[in-house]
Curated annotation (Swiss-Prot):
Catalytic activity annotation: [protein]-L-glutamate 5-O-methyl ester + H2O = L-glutamyl-[protein] + methanol + H(+); L-glutaminyl-[protein] + H2O = L-glutamyl-[protein] + NH4(+)
Xref: SMART domains: REC
UniProt xrefs under Pfam families: CheB_methylest (PF01339), Response_reg (PF00072)
Signal peptide: none
Reported function: Involved in chemotaxis. Part of a chemotaxis signal transduction system that modulates chemotaxis in response to various stimuli. Catalyzes the demethylation of specific methylglutamate residues introduced into the chemoreceptors (methyl-accepting chemotaxis proteins or MCP) by CheR. Also mediates the irreversible deamidation of specific glutamine residues to glutamic acid.
NCBIfam families for the chain: PRK00742.1, PRK12555.1
Protein name (record): Protein-glutamate methylesterase/protein-glutamine glutaminase 1
PTM field: Phosphorylated by CheA. Phosphorylation of the N-terminal regulatory domain activates the methylesterase activity.
Cystine connections: none
Source organism per UniProt: Burkholderia thailandensis (strain ATCC 700388 / DSM 13276 / CCUG 48851 / CIP 106301 / E264)
Amino acid sequence: MQKKIKVLCVDDSALIRSLMTEIINSQPDMEVCATAPDPLVARELIKQHNPDVLTLDVEMPRMDGLDFLEKLMRLRPMPVVMVSSLTERGSEITLRALELGAVDFVTKPRVGIRDGMLEYAEKLADKVRAASRARVRQNPQPHAAAAAAAHGQTAAAAPLINNPLVSTEKLIIVGASTGGTEAIREVLTPLPPDAPAVLIAQHMPPGFTRSFAQRLNGLCRISVKEAEHGERVLPGHAYIAPGHAHLLLARSGANYIAHLSDDPPVNRHRPSVDVLFRSAAQHAGKNALGVILTGMGRDGAAGLLEMKKAGAYTFAQDEASCVVFGMPREAIAMGGVDDVAPLSDMSRRIMARLASMGDRVQRV
């Protein structure tokens, strides 16, 4: 009999603890081994139960979730799924938690509202399963490299790429899920200010993508923003799919245009990586580079293969540097990947490939 995933739920709301316990215990492969109203109680329960996964509320009394997470990742690294409110403050704190080493996050369940609860339960269970298999980063220190990149200094973990490029038609198309927020940061921060435009589909709910874009914009030398429908896609800019919509690449004459769609989810996701990749295959062809990063599931694998068939050069993050080696594994298995790269070298390889593409990208 397969061993069940042991989950410790930490939340100051007894109602939320009860609801999370009900959802997790309804799954055949996982169980709640204990619950805690605050991090100080959780600390003792971790010693007693040795859980496989921790779900952690962002804001709690006695010690907030971030302080506890920082100590936990330093002293006893383990997979953590943050539980966050759908507020601007909640999204900012959650992004900081992902920087500190949390594997993923879910929004708080809406107590007393049954509509959508089955979908929420499936999402929570999927994230707990993925977290139980995730590679937890030991003592993550994201700010040093990111701050260095923002100020034009070289950091050992993320050397800046200073090959000036002039390109009006090259595009970098990126897809990610679990662990993707930090992977995307590591890919974007070394890019030079005149890098080709970057379009990104990261699995993330509404309300979080804007904060994610704003956070990256303060760390990167390129401009980063949440994509808007109909806007022109420009070099030196990165466009992140909003949490409520698919992002597609479109054309208006010689110009690339961002197109947002509220079509149904694809592979259970909106935004979907496959949707973005397929639009890039159709409208950019060999002028695009496709990049699939860490994430559970298979979203993006088929789309990356379509990009490759259309002439694009494609990259996948390697297993050793992925938090969850799901999407890249599927893309590699389908034959849609030209180059498998560690995350620490991904930006350099992308820019080297662009520089090798002849008269379509020139050094100056």
